[in-house]
């Protein structure tokens, strides 16, 4: 019984769209779903507020967030890792 225990917490990958608040980033997560009636693949988006303790993630970064205990009224997610750094032009 040395199996790795699967986490029950959800993880999502999204792009940072705001980093203006202290210790908080706003993450835009896009998912693709099939329209029930017409069958077309449609992109749906959701915004989540995630806890960023050190303030290290910046606008445009792609990050992974994990569900956690409520941190504030709107914050129930914590930044887990950086997937891709934003490219500065």
Curated annotation (Swiss-Prot):
SUPFAM superfamilies: Nucleic acid-binding proteins. The keyword Coiled coil does not apply. Belongs to the universal ribosomal protein uS17 family. It comes from the Bacteria. Part of the 30S ribosomal subunit. GO terms for molecular function: rRNA binding; structural constituent of ribosome. It holds the Pfam family Ribosomal_S17. CDD domains: Ribosomal_uS17. One of the primary rRNA binding proteins, it binds specifically to the 5'-end of 16S ribosomal RNA. GO terms for cellular component: cytosolic small ribosomal subunit. GO terms for biological process: translation. This is Small ribosomal subunit protein uS17. Keywords: Ribonucleoprotein, Ribosomal protein, RNA-binding, rRNA-binding.
């Amino acid at each position: 019984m040395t199996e790795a225990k699967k986490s029950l917490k959800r993880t999502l990958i999204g792009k940072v769209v705001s980093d203006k608040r202290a210790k908080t980033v706003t993450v835009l997560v896009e998912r693709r779903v099939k329209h029930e009636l017409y069958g077309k693949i449609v992109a749906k988006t959701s915004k989540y507020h995630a806890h960023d303790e050190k303030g290290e993630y910046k606008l445009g970064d792609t990050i992974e967030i994990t569900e956690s205990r409520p941190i504030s009224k709107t914050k129930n997610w914590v930044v887990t890792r950086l997937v891709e750094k934003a490219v500065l032009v």
